[in-house]
Amino acid sequence: MKDSEILNELTPVAESLLERHLSTTKEWFPHDYVPYGRGRDHESGTTWSPDDADLGGFEIGPEVRSALLVNLLTEDNLPYYFRTVEQLFGKDGAWGTWVRRWTAEEGRHSMAIYGYLMTTRAIDPVELERSRMAQVSGGETPNPPLHEGFIYLALQELATRISHRNTGALLGDPVGYEVMKRVGSDENLHQLFYRDLAAAAIEVDPNTMMIAMEKQVRSFAMPGTGIPDFDRHAALIAKAGIYDLQIHHEQILAPVVLRQWGADKITGLSGDGAAAQERLMKRLATSERVAKRFAERRDAALATA
């Protein structure tokens, strides 16, 4: 189906999902979550040290700092994500209303996380700002076609939610945990919108959606690839168990692609769609094996540490 045809076919679904979202989401204010009482002036020219951090008596390592930096910079890249999603869905009707509402909600995330990081001095503010300038100046974001966009957005929002929540759990600081929990709750509602939208698209155009699903599962990458030194940060994040291969398979691919979308049970596929389904099932089986090996190696390393 052409993009205009599937968007028209899915408009009632988008309207229903938008109404569900608006009736479920709760108003909140970033300033309510920022511990301003811990804040003090940042003197220009001073060099940040981990000892400067005030995390309510808790300490964090470089893995959690990398996660905080990547999580915030991902949210800071919102202008480009807005551009991408608006290009996919358009400006009119429920589609445009959703894009603008999603953007407004996402905007609060960077405000809350940034406020927490600046008042607590959890990470180096100079490194953070230089990384933000580099990333946003580059404007690097995924730019999938419509059918793949349905898949990517659902997987990406869930991955972001998991990353935020796991980061908060490792902070130790109850205030920081609440910040990341609040942001993660928004991301969960967003992924529900995209997940169910993708499910409806599969019913309408199963063949093209199966091809899109296989491609996105094969090539999926967390947002943030434009962040300076992203590979090093991603390795630290995986080492801490915030987001790794096991989590990606067990908490994203298996529950969404297999259980929610029932990728292995979709019927009525043509040659290309059936071939994509076969490749997808093989890839998911490989992903499961890799996830198990990753977990075994990590557990062995922890046992000998």
Where are these regions (language model features)?
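Non-heme di-metal
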Residues: 1-305
